């Protein structure tokens, strides 16, 4: 049975009429939200951020994380995120021009799903105590996903939106977004500079950085010459070969 991950289903409330009049920055004059790692986000944005999507779901990097201020410390709030398709167009990466270009109308979008932060609901004091990270949010291109992942269309452009909703009054919804978090959903990275920046800045890609063997010189018979690149990688790969040799000796 398909589950409903819409904002109204999550809040167990009926849809609110004229919702656009409720979700406005006029209602947020006391609440402030600041993007963490904004410098990193801008580096990606300047190149044209890409986010990998898979059928099973893939987490975002950079991770969306914000600092919230101006909440009532004793009131309870639900904090959630959805993705807004900001251009109803399909894009492709032009390698000749080194940029993304529109190729025509986009695919129809399903109603936006919400990713509810696992701490919800919580008092304002809790949300303001430390950065709020959405590191567990996953993106999928599976239109039939029933795991609560955010569904997107590949080669389409999206922007995350952070929603802060008072638990006792769901009509008091405050929405924030940041231009530098825009991205294009892809099933494989298109811009090699994005790939390099992801490897450089993602702590989970440390292994790729350490084991990168580009620049290792090969001699005429295919052996390694022991250049600087090999010397830096050897301490990392030696345990593997030592263990392999040990196993071979045991199996003799």
Swiss-Prot record:
Gene that this sequence comes from: mls-1
UniProt subcellular location: Nucleus
Keywords tagged on the record: Developmental protein, DNA-binding, Nucleus, Transcription, Transcription regulation
Record's subunit section: May interact with unc-37.
Organism: Caenorhabditis elegans
Role played: Probable transcription factor required for the cell fate specification of non-striated uterine muscle precursor cells. Furthermore, may function with the transcriptional corepressor unc-37.
Regions annotated as coiled coil: none
Predominant localisation class: nucleus
Protein name, as recorded: T-box transcription factor mls-1
């Amino acid at each position: 049975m398909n589950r409903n991950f819409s904002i109204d289903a999550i809040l167990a409330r009926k849809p609110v009429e004229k919702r656009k009049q409720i979700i406005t920055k006029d209602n947020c004059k006391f609440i402030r939200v600041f993007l963490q790692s904004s410098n990193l986000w801008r580096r990606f944005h300047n190149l044209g951020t890409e986010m990998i999507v898979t059928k099973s779901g893939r987490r975002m990097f950079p991770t969306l994380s914000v600092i919230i201020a101006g909440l009532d410390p004793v009131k309870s709030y639900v904090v959630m995120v959805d993705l807004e398709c900001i251009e109803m167009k399909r894009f492709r990466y032009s390698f000749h021009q080194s940029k993304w270009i529109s190729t025509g109308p986009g695919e129809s979008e399903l109603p936006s799903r919400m990713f509810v932060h696992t701490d919800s609901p919580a008092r304002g004091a809790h949300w303001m105590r430390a950065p709020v990270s959405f590191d567990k949010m996953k993106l999928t291109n599976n239109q039939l996903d029933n795991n609560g992942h955010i569904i997107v269309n590949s080669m389409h452009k999206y922007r995350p939106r952070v929603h802060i909703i008072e638990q006792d009054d769901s009509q008091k919804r405050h929405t924030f977004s940041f231009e530098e978090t825009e991205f294009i959903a892809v099933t494989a990275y298109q811009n090699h500079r994005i790939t390099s920046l992801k490897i450089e800045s993602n702590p989970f890609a440390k292994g790729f950085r350490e084991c990168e063997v580009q620049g290792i010189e090969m001699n005429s018979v295919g052996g390694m010459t022991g250049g600087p690149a090999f010397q830096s990688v050897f301490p990392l790969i030696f345990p593997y070969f030592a263990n392999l040799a040990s196993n071979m000796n045991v199996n003799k």
